[in-house]
């Protein structure tokens, strides 16, 4: 062959090899596509690793995670569908209280970004429990924490964070501008109630799933206030109690029935010798029971129970094991206000079981220190001070504060009963610890169980003063 023929022959062979290679690649692509189609069937998800897709459907968050493994899409998780929290079950039978959470927020806040708060409480949906709290619009160990002993200011807001976590700007959700608040879930959405404004003209702003649905104006112009713990939802309706009037005398108390954030009914209690503040409420067999604070003249706690039509009964816990603070030594109780050391008080709770009652209270008679749970088997109706169980929660040497009830519905736990739980606020700083310029709190919580529990002390544990205090 001459040189030109050699070049033509080599070129022809190269072109032929290239065409064959191209056909093989096309065949390979067709084979891979066919194999992928067979594996995924009718799925049309893109093959992106760890793609998180969140959609909002009928007031329900639907959260899917698609994980790509070897060209196969695997769906992880399940739809978080809406339910209606019935509240028709009875309280679970319990023998004691198991530690549930401890957020250590003040200890963490000495070095981290943690909100200055008070009045924390817990509420659960059918999917999760959350901690709600009233922030002061300031962080611990910062100059704006100065003066946060004040209860009512325009900087306070209701916020929430995952249960057991220290409340910070990074994990917390804004709920409402408020210096008094409540919140609860009906199975379809969160209802929040935030009260803010001047003492003589405060307004409660109701939100459902974050949208303002109604407002309630102070009707006595004497510091409208609400529970500082969860409201109660039964069969799609939610219930809360508000107070307006003196803290040291007869005031006005109203029960509100709320559906999807709209007030559908309200009544004023006819309770001339009673005083209701900061009620801790829970559902039990379709009715609502609230145990409250008498800041006027009772060292035992007043209660009100009502059905979904707001037909109600009222009374005081009769036990000689007194639940308020300050209070006298245990002795002879009364089904009316026990007026010895009856002035002032602290938010608290109890759980009624027939004629018996679990009473949560500070260990100290005078100071908000320590905390204990006492089972009085006849204390709802009898006036003696005999009890059969006492469980220590916080030692008398450590600070406590407000306490309140919350429940876990069968839709969350899978039980056939409503689980009773409670939280305790552990207040630090002013007015009792005057080496600081601030007031804040951490919290612990417990749930009722019918098994072994521990007697111990779970105190706040922060070492004061902080750097900002020096």
Swiss-Prot record:
Residue positions the entry lists as glycosylated? 44, 58, 63, 70, 88, 146, 235, 386, 434, 455
**Compartments (UniProt record):** Virion membrane; Host apical cell membrane
User: Where do the segments described as Head of neuraminidase lie?
Assistant: 91-470
- Principal location class: virion
Region span, Hypervariable stalk region: 36-90
* Annotated substrate binding sites: 118, 152, 277-278, 293, 368
Q: Which residues cross the membrane?
A: 7-27
Pfam families this protein is in?
Answer: Neur
Question: Which residues carry out catalysis?
Answer: 151, 402
Query: Could you state what the record's PTM comment says about this protein?
Result: N-glycosylated.
Q: What is its EC number?
A: 3.2.1.18
Topology: which residues are Virion surface?
28-470
- Give this protein's Gene Ontology molecular function annotations: exo-alpha-sialidase activity; metal ion binding
Q: What else is known?
A: The influenza A genome consist of 8 RNA segments. Genetic variation of hemagglutinin and/or neuraminidase genes results in the emergence of new influenza strains. The mechanism of variation can be the result of point mutations or the result of genetic reassortment between segments of two different strains.
Chain's role: Catalyzes the removal of terminal sialic acid residues from viral and cellular glycoconjugates. Cleaves off the terminal sialic acids on the glycosylated HA during virus budding to facilitate virus release. Additionally helps virus spread through the circulation by further removing sialic acids from the cell surface. These cleavages prevent self-aggregation and ensure the efficient spread of the progeny virus from cell to cell. Otherwise, infection would be limited to one round of replication.
Domain notes from UniProt: Intact N-terminus is essential for virion morphogenesis. Possesses two apical sorting signals, one in the ectodomain, which is likely to be a glycan, and the other in the transmembrane domain. The transmembrane domain also plays a role in lipid raft association.
Q: Which family does it belong to?
A: Belongs to the glycosyl hydrolase 34 family.
Protein name per Swiss-Prot or TrEMBL: Neuraminidase
What is the organism field in this record?
A: Influenza A virus (strain A/New Zealand:South Canterbury/35/2000 H1N1)
